[in-house]
Amino acid sequence: MKVIAVDKVVLAFSGGLDTSVCIKLLEEKYNMEVITACVDVGQPRDEIERPAMVAKELGNYRHYTVDARREFAEDYIFPAIKANAVYEGYPLSTALARPLIAKKIVEVAEKEGASAIAHGCTGKGNDQFRFEAVIRSTTDLDVIAPIRDLNLTRTEEMEYARSCGIPLPSDKLYSIDENLWGRAIEGDILEDPMVEPPEDAFEWTKPIHETPEDPEVIEIGFHGGVPVALNGEELEPVELIGLANEVAGKHGIGRVDIMEDRIIGMKSREIYETPAAFLLLEAHRGLEQLTLTRSELRFADIISSTYAELVYSGLWHDPLREDLDMAVNHMQRRVTGTVRVKLHRGSMRVIGRESPYSLYSEEIVSFEDKTLDQREMAGMVKNYALQAAIYSRVCRKEN
């Protein structure tokens, strides 16, 4: 394998086995000075503090911790809400975070004058595409993926870690990836698609038998398609998403168990918890139904699937995604108002919505109103199914 001749590299670092092994590999196999960086997109506090401690323990490496929570909410999650971006039933929590993490790692590398960026992705997952698509779209820095490039198995990683004195992780049942928008759960027992996920795999969502007996009604305020308030209280983006996670999660809302089609073509059983995403997306769609025209709603469905496919596939910087954002932002300018949602025992439904841009007219809909002259409908109805009528006549002639 050709070794890239570089002096300094910034490693996207979590402090786990993969990236800890990468530190030593980058030094020994690539002869580079390693700088580590962790990007905060809403992980638990211990997952933000651990990388700095591990980097120090492994060799006192220079380490960066970058707080990107607000940027993640405003520039990634909110555009996804406006586009109703969901991939195969999955609200894209991990997929949305990766381009931002890559962006911040690039910024650290440029600040340090590094020649390369490294990550700990394997050759079977989606993240290698998501990281490298952003890096190669925004910089000329080299990209190194030691685990993938050296074709290491998990067992080989652990053997190498032992030889280097790297502490091995405790035997955890699950591998977790968590951010503001969701929690992804993986583990050996979950790889069998016939095995129900054990209850101990979940943290954000309650099992149905532990949810409140009484339903809860919550009001969500939107401005231009973006959630801005809960129960009449305007909140900062990070706080609003966190509170929405708590409210929906305690009612058992937000669990996802799907067979997901990965970028490379393989199917994978994936488990997610995304309570805030379920709640906010449902409310957003409810408000769109009140404020967008029928043709806009139909086109929004097309945008939603295309947008989600681009994000999932790591193509955040594809020009089409930017084009779609422009169209979405124009359509969303009237998606302002309040939506009332009832949560109970793992279910939710929109039970009320209002907007200054409402296209609903109670007067016209009323059976007692004569604003719309019913007699004018006769001509429209007569020719409404014209093609179907012609087709039927043609078929009768054939018979």
UniProtKB/Swiss-Prot annotation:
Keywords (A to Z) from UniProt: Amino-acid biosynthesis, Arginine biosynthesis, ATP-binding, Cytoplasm, Ligase, Nucleotide-binding
Q: Which GO terms describe its biological process?
A: argininosuccinate metabolic process; L-arginine biosynthetic process; urea cycle
Q: Which reaction does it catalyse?
A: L-citrulline + L-aspartate + ATP = 2-(N(omega)-L-arginino)succinate + AMP + diphosphate + H(+)
Q: Which domain of life is it from?
A: Archaea
Residues binding L-citrulline: Y90, N126, R130, S175, E260, Y272
> What GO cellular component term, any one, is given?
cytoplasm
Q: What Pfam families does the record tag this protein with?
A: Arginosuc_syn_C (PF20979), Arginosuc_synth (PF00764)
Query: In which pathway is this protein known to take part?
Result: Amino-acid biosynthesis; L-arginine biosynthesis; L-arginine from L-ornithine and carbamoyl phosphate: step 2/3
Gene3D superfamilies named among the record's database cross-references = Argininosuccinate synthetase, chain A, domain 2, HUPs
Q: Which residues bind ATP?
A: A12, F13, S14, G15, G16, L17, D18, T19, S20, G120
Please indicate if the UniProt record lists Cell cycle as a keyword.
no
What the entry lists under InterPro entries is as follows: Arginosuc_syn_C (IPR048268), Arginosuc_syn_N (IPR048267), Arginosuc_synth (IPR001518), Arginosuc_synth_CS (IPR018223), Arginosuc_synth_type_1_subfam (IPR023434), AS_cat/multimer_dom_body (IPR024074), Rossmann-like_a/b/a_fold (IPR014729)
Molecular function via GO: argininosuccinate synthase activity; ATP binding
Top-level enzyme category = ligase
Q: Which residues cross the membrane?
A: none
Question: What quaternary arrangement does the UniProt entry report?
Answer: Homotetramer.
Q: Which PANTHER family match?
A: ARGININOSUCCINATE SYNTHASE
- Which protein family is named in the record? Belongs to the argininosuccinate synthase family. Type 1 subfamily.
What is this protein identified as?
A: Argininosuccinate synthase
Q: What organism is recorded for this protein?
A: Methanothermobacter thermautotrophicus (strain ATCC 29096 / DSM 1053 / JCM 10044 / NBRC 100330 / Delta H)
In the UniProt record, what gene is named as encoding this protein? Answer: argG
